[in-house]
């Protein structure tokens, strides 16, 4: 009897360790967030771990932060509860020469033809470059010419909605006007209806 209790105790212990390791493995890649601009290149630099998502190489965001700019805000979040979601934004002001150089770089990017997705009717500042996909979201850069300021935003996700509550992280003034990628958004509702009709 003692031998059976020992064997069961060892099995129970190993089972708990296995479950703990499984949870640790799953949780470690579920959430990755930074607001530390010193980590920018680690996340979005040329070799950044989130420079390419869903087959889209993010050349809209700069590869490096120019030395002569004043970063106003930065946030990057990777979240993967079941499917990956990416949220990022960078806001900086710069001198007129840097502004003109970056404006030209962005203007030379071949943007998506369809820019108004998920209810978007316009953008709050001049749109310089944009990648959109009606399934996975958008990446775009805005120019606030009055203040020599650039705003870069990434909102990428799966299944026609963003698991990240993006409105809690990105100020509304940087989001497309009318944009709705919440779980119950009208575009997702329509796409799911069409999917289930087939």
Tell where the protein language model's regions lie, with residue ranges.
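Residue-level signal for well-ordered alpha-helical segments
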Residues: 7, 46, 51, 118-120
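Alpha-helix initiation/capping motif
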Residues: 2, 77, 144-145
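N-terminal Sec-pathway targeting helices
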Residues: 1-20
């Amino acid at each position: 009897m003692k031998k059976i209790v020992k064997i069961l105790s060892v099995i129970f212990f190993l089972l708990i360790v296995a479950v703990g390791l499984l949870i640790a493995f799953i949780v470690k890649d579920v959430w990755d967030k930074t607001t530390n601009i010193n980590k920018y290149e680690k996340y979005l630099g040329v070799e950044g771990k989130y420079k390419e998502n869903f087959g889209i190489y993010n050349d809209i965001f700069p590869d490096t932060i120019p030395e002569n700019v004043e970063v106003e805000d930065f946030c990057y979040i990777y979240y993967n509860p079941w499917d990956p979601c990416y949220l990022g934004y960078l806001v900086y002001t710069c001198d007129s020469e840097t502004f003109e150089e970056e404006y030209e770089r962005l203007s030379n990017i071949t943007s998506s033809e369809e820019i108004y997705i998920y209810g978007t009717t316009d953008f709050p500042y001049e749109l310089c470059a944009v990648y959109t996909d009606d399934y996975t979201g958008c990446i775009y850069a805005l120019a606030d010419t009055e203040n020599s300021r650039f705003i870069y935003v990434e909102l990428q996700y799966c299944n026609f909605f963003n698991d990240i509550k993006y409105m809690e992280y990105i100020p509304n003034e940087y989001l497309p006007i009318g944009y709705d990628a919440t779980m119950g958004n009208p575009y997702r509702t329509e796409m799911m209806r069409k999917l289930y009709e087939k």
